[in-house]
Design a protein with these regions (language model features):
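A common structural junction motif
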Residues: 108-120, 217-224
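Short acidic/His-enriched helical or mixed secondary-structure segments at domain edges of catalytic enzymes
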Residues: 134-150, 285, 289
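His/Glu-rich zincin catalytic helix
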Residues: 1-69, 172, 185-286
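Acidic/histidine-enriched alpha-helical segments
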Residues: 61-64, 116-141, 226-235
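Active-site glycine-rich loop that binds ribose-phosphate moieties when present
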Residues: 177-187
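Short, polar/flexible loop-turn hinges at active-site or ligand-entry regions and domain interfaces
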Residues: 52-55, 96-100, 116-126
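M16 family metallopeptidases and their MPP-like homologs
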Residues: 14-16, 22-42, 59-112, 149-174, ...
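Structured segments of extracytoplasmic/periplasmic soluble domains
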Residues: 48-51, 69, 112-117, 135, ...
Length: 315
């Protein structure tokens, strides 16, 4: 594998050249500090960009073009890391050399999708927006169908209210009705201008050529006038809190959470990760599961350390 980094005005292009795979993977990554007030906008915008574009202004046209690119796959993912939010637009495509195609045809697709969404007169397409909002609403509401994730989200809301830890990365249904084609476009422009952006690509490609294609077709001027922090200052809980919630489900869940404070940088980066591995091995041990099911009538479905609080390093 050959690793290279290319400077492109206000963003970087990170490449890994390898012939181990017959497909290539590309990501356009947006990073910023998470904000509860606009997390729903970000969730909707991510879905809008991968739904259609100005050039391919319907889902059908979008899918036909992806099929023409040998069944390429374009999708968006938003995650929270500490107190930051990361939105990635991902593109999986076949190694162009295997089908004797110009790499430009593949690389331009995700770049154009991000820079030229389905916008007219500074407004996103209303029909697409209403469809996407309904889909996002279902995604938000469907968490109750997953007892494990639902209980964890409720645990964080109870433990860490009014902090980044408790923010639902999918957004909030009460905010969906406030989103209009115009407000979504304004948020899009703000994200393009103020999010930190990087491009990642891996595959058997001429990376010098690919980096030039990206530079020529992805021209953004990012105003980096703020720092992105991953630290979350969760308040110390002096008394333990309990939350009971009952609803119809075939599986009951008990979540126990606690804030780990005064970690050193070494403990956070290494000890916690190793301890996570030990816990994961424990819950997947067949003998442990048999004993729990036979004598305790329950099973452990997950134990992990969620690094939600990042205090300053203790010297």
């Amino acid at each position: 594998m050959i690793y290279k980094t290319y400077k492109a005005n206000t963003y970087n292009i990170y490449t890994i050249k390898t012939d181990k795979f017959k497909t290539c993977h590309m990501e356009i990554v947006f990073r910023n500090n998470i904000d509860k007030n606009d997390i729903t906008l970000r969730s909707v915008l991510t879905e809008m960009i991968v739904e259609n574009t100005k050039k391919y202004n319907t889902r059908r046209k979008m899918m036909i073009e992806l099929e023409n690119l040998y069944n390429a796959y374009f999708y968006g993912v938003t995650n929270r890391v500490g107190s930051s939010v990361i939105t990635s637009f991902c593109f999986d495509f076949i190694d162009p050399s295997l089908v004797k195609e110009n790499a430009l045809d593949f690389i331009k697709f995700p770049l154009e999708a991000v820079l030229n969404p389905n916008v007219k007169n500074n407004e996103f397409d209303l029909i697409t927006l209403e469809y996407v909002k309904e889909r996002v609403k279902k995604d938000i509401e469907s968490i109750i169908e997953d007892p494990k994730n639902y209980s964890i989200s409720k645990l964080l809301e109870k433990m860490c209210p009014d902090t980044e830890s408790s923010i639902n990365i999918n957004g909030y249904t009460k905010d969906l009705d406030k989103i209009t084609p115009e407000t979504l476009y304004n948020f899009y422009i703000n994200m393009i201008k103020h999010d930190y952006i990087d491009v990642y690509i891996i595959g058997n490609l001429d990376m010098d050529k690919i980096s030039n294609i990206i530079k020529n077709n992805f021209k953004v001027n990012i105003l980096k006038n703020h720092n992105i922090t991953y630290n979350i200052n969760n308040k110390i809980i002096k008394k333990h809190k309990k939350l009971y919630e009952s609803f119809s489900t075939s599986q009951e869940n008990i979540c126990i959470g606690l804030n780990i404070t005064n970690e050193t940088k070494f403990e956070k980066n290494y000890v916690a990760n190793i301890y996570n591995m030990i816990l994961e091995e424990y819950i997947h041990d067949v003998n442990v599961q048999i004993l729990l099911e036979r004598y305790a009538h329950f099973e452990i479905i997950g134990i992990s350390i969620l690094q939600l609080q990042f205090p300053k390093e203790n010297k």
